Amino acid sequence: MEKQPKFDYSDIKFKDNGKLKLIIVVGTRPEIIRLAAVINKCRLYFDVILAHTGQNYDYNLNGIFFKDLKLAEPEVYMDAVGDDLGATCGNIINCSYKLFAKTKPDGVLVLGDTNSCLSVIGAKRLHIPIFHMEAGNRCKDECLPEETNRRIVDIISDVNMAYSEHARRYLADCGLPKERTYVTGSPMAEVLHNNLSEIEASDVHQRLGLEKGKYILLSAHREENIDTEKNFLSLFNAINHMAEKYDMPILYSCHPRSRNRLAASGFQLDPRVIQHEPLGFHDYNCLQMNAFAVVSDSGTLPEESSFFTSVGHPFPAICIRTSTERPEAIDKGDFIIAGIDEKSLLQAVDTAVELCKDGQHGIPVPDYVDENVSTKVVKIVQSYVGIINKMVWRKF
């Protein structure tokens, strides 16, 4: 029997230990990864409930990262995934509203642009201060569902925490209050630094039979690349030609939706393209830092490229998209936007690899190097709960 959304939260309670009561909402692998250090830091200083919407329900997209990143299991699983997108979004809002109404947190914290972030709609209706990390990111591509979510969550949030000055300017252009917008930087450097010894110690190459520097790492899962027929065929024809051209394994960290799409289409991948279940945090990053090239549509690619360059492990980073919400990483030359057609993708891989061989690496993005982002977030949340209650909601 399929899980049903959880609407009864009578069993969920804060510890009531006198600390600020904060609910952190997650739902996908990227949120769990980026928030790892923030969640652990908040648990030290606040009374925290971690709520998981269930948007990513596969263990390899979810549970393995709690283990790798030394995170306690969420106090709440909403099981909000519905039969279609409308049902899922509706369940996320409904479940979150009921959770917030029952537990009465002092604040709600979300990160990014996933459907799980729509939980803040319930918090807004209940006059609960909302804190949004990764605010102000824009790629200006209306085909991306995340772009809609970004606008909604930025506008609803009471305090927006941006990664960069680019993002802060976007927020200002939207008319959002400058006095409640801060640049914290990306939380990824802190997470990667905290896990660097485990990343370097991973035996993933031995387990998978791969030789360092002689494989291409592939990650392709975005809706616009997988669900759109034209883009899907263009991308995977290019991947097959890449395998033929470089004559080396292409390890494809393949999400369930991508695997299902490939199976349903009957598309024949080159034998050198190896489909693998999504990899854990330590294994994936060990593979990145030792790859001939990394070809990915992941939003964290620019941040990971910047970090590994800063610690002496640069890799050729190629983004299989036509836009980016991280222009600050383009400013510093940390990755190449390749598009998804065969010619431009192969040219981009060639260029990135040759530049790396010549020692022409990008420069670490200043907004991506701070390793105290979790501390900044704790101080901002503690500072602004009272201010929002007084200045926005007139509670006292």
Residue positions per predicted region:
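Nucleotide-activated sugar donor-binding and catalytic core shared by glycosyltransferases
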Residues: 1-248, 258-396
